[in-house]
Amino acid sequence: MAMWMQVVIIPFLVSFTCVWLIHPAIAKMAIIRGLTDNPNARKLQKSPVPVMGGMAVFFGIIVSAGVTSIVFNSYALFTCVVTMTVMMYMGFIDDLVGIKPWIRIAIEVAVIGFVVIMDLVNINDFHGLFGIGKLPVYVSLPLCAFSGVGIINAINMIDGVDGLSSGLGIFISFVFGCVFFYSHDFTMAVMAFATMGALVPFFFKNVFGHLSKMFIGDSGTMMMGIILCIFCMRTIDNTSRVSRAYPDLGVIAFCLAALSIPVFDTVRVMLLRIYHGRSPFIADKTHLHHVFIRLGFSHIGTTVCINILEFINVLSFFLTYWLGASVTLQFIVVVLTSCTTTIGMYFFLSYLDKHHRTNRLITTVSVYSQRFVQQRFYKAMTRLMDKGM
């Protein structure tokens, strides 16, 4: 069997099929048990929505990983499954009763430590960024913990409108999956495409479903966060197959580009909260997706626009790499592009909203995104997604 079938197609199809089949049953159970996210002044939904989407995604990834582990016997798959399970259950408890921020952070640090010990990967090499190579242990371990906690919570905090976190998760998993595949890191490629396959059916049901709509919840975003954290650690580690296959590729710049929208938007939001004397962990409506909604965009319009911004950041990185830029220049370009598409875009859109200014392009896209949800295609997709409910 061709390697691309084993690494790409089979993991994707197995996880996709599992989530598609089990999603209605989990949604029904959540409704019966009252496991729903209820609307309030901060949230954007107008009615209670089941919050167990992360369970469906988890099931798809686990089954896919189990099937492919027959071919790829790797500690990395075991590590991914264990850490996903811990983070999924922690997020589920947080969805139900809430967990104090410091307890969540402590668990996240412990899980990241488990990854470092079991999988022997770490953020221990800058690969020439600013002339820095291998890092001593007393620097790499705290950096790994800090970065990992940041990635997990960035994915969690970006989850604000239908399809946004899952849409970004699909794109980011695809990008990592392609890089892992062409670097011959097939174990991580399997996890990336299994994650992508599990998120695709959830995305469609989350965006188009009515009766079948579920939120991914903290259980799903925490699980996605640790998977993406492992992808980054695997890419940056000094034994990375990616850096061996592509020695001129800035692996830190690549990871930052792949996670640019969640990371840079979260950093901006937390700094603004601290500046205004508020706790960085108390949710508000200052994320990039909130300003799109205030300007009249639909949820799907907001999701599409933010994914386009993410695509621009990743494309700018690869263009810089293909043009032969140094590792440091690749990093600088990613930072500048990401700041423009997140911080710059937020303040530009906020200015339009605050001063009631109009922009022809923004207005056109906003109006079309609202009309889209009234078109026949959207309604047909809703009927398809709600089958079995």
Predicted regions and their residues:
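Alpha-helical transmembrane segments
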Residues: 2-29, 33-34, 58-74, 78-89, ...
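Juxtamembrane helix-capping/reentrant segments at transmembrane boundaries
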Residues: 38-52, 213
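Short aromatic-rich membrane-water interface segments that cap or initiate transmembrane helices
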Residues: 44-50, 130-141, 251-255
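A generic, lipid-embedded transmembrane alpha helix
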Residues: 49-66, 113-118
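Transmembrane alpha-helix boundary signature
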Residues: 63-75, 93-99, 116-130, 236-239
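Membrane-embedded alpha-helical core segments of multi-pass
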Residues: 82-90, 107-122, 143-153, 169-175, ...
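Membrane interface segments of multi-pass transport proteins and intramembrane proteases
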Residues: 97, 125-135, 297, 318, ...
